[in-house]
A protein has these predicted regions:
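A short, well-structured juxtamembrane/interface segment
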Residues: 21, 26-28, 48-51, 127-131
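Buried hydrophobic packing segments
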Residues: 1-8, 49-52
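Glycine-rich phosphate-binding loop signature in dinucleotide/nucleotide-binding domains
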Residues: 8-11, 58-62, 134-141
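Generic C-terminus detector
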Residues: 106-162
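Active-site beta-alpha connecting loops in nucleotide-dependent enzymes
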Residues: 25, 36-37, 42-119, 123, ...
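Gly/charged, well-structured mid-domain segments that form the phosphate/adenylate-handling core
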Residues: 4-43
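Residue-level signal for inorganic ion chemistry
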Residues: 1, 98, 143
Length: 162
């Protein structure tokens, strides 16, 4: 950006202002302060889910994962994309538990079972109870959720936030 601005003889201070005030969009590595940090990310296709899992795995601390999977109109009713995402990436020693929640929690749990994660899976269909469970675990946590789960989950996280 700076190179282009410089080549066009534009004022570089404008870029500085933008960089200093830029904030990520909702559900893009958004952090909430529960008993421990909780990061939420939107997933809506295999590529997005794979990138989020790569980011999660870049953090070496012990952690919990929660996946909220819905199939409302805005999400798209076809959730077959979960079979194309590389959920085997969650088969890590430092991932202690994976909570499956949302309207299609059991579909997500089945998908994870096929990756050999059955000992780490806990299904909590109710989103409020799932977030409360994460908070009580007192461990860094990462939430991956589909579009319609994102707004509801963010609202729950705001209420739980310290």
């Amino acid at each position: 950006v700076l190179c282009v601005m410089k080549s066009l003889n534009l004022d570089l201070s404008n870029a500085d202002k933008v960089f200093r005030t830029y904030s990520l969009k909702e559900g893009r590595n958004e952090e909430f302060n529960l008993n421990k940090p909780c990061i939420i990310n939107l997933i809506k296709n295999p590529t997005g889910a794979n990138e989020v899992m790569k980011e999660i795995n870049s953090h070496e601390e012990d952690k919990m994962i929660c996946i909220f999977l819905n199939d409302n109109d805005q999400d798209g009713h076809d959730i077959s994309w979960i079979w194309d995402a590389h959920f085997e990436r969650l088969n890590q020693k430092n991932i202690r538990e994976i909570v499956c929640s949302g309207l299609r929690a059991y579909d997500m749990a089945l998908r994870l079972k096929y990756e050999g994660l059955e000992d780490k899976i806990k299904v909590i269909e109710d989103c409020v109870k799932a977030v409360h469970y994460l908070n009580e675990a007192n461990m860094n946590s990462y939430i991956m959720c589909t579009y319609t789960a994102l707004h509801a989950t963010r609202a729950i996280l705001r209420k739980e936030e310290k």
